Regions:
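Terminal domain-initiation and capping elements
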Residues: 1-104
Length: 104
């Protein structure tokens, strides 16, 4: 009877455990610019987002052709860290590559 308790009216009431809610997921979006090389974008996708060379190439082409591309979808804290990592890597390499978060 660990999951039950008696109410004030003497009836046995079952404890209702709150349902665990999945965390909100955020897209990490890479934004195209005229200076960051395709090779560097592929490197970022492979190292920061653990994409295979083929996946990284496809994602890089999406960024190149459409002006933006989804690098991955993560919970807030992970997505925020990945955006900071991309920005830091790009600045250290001398590129203006930007990453953004979108709910979704």
């Amino acid at each position: 009877m660990a999951d039950e308790q008696r109410g004030t009216d003497g009836a046995v009431r079952e404890r209702v455990k709150p349902k665990k809610q999945d965390p909100t997921l955020y897209k990490v979006v890479l934004l195209n610019d005229d200076y960051t090389t395709m090779e560097f974008v592929i490197h970022v996708l492979e190292t920061v987002f653990q994409q295979s060379p083929a996946e990284a190439y496809r994602a890089m082409m999406q960024v190149h052709v459409n002006g933006r591309g989804i690098a991955g979808v993560y919970p807030w804290e992970v997505a925020e860290t990945k955006v900071e990592t991309v920005t830091s890597m790009a600045r250290e390499a001398g590129f203006p590559l930007r990453a953004a978060l979108e709910e979704g």
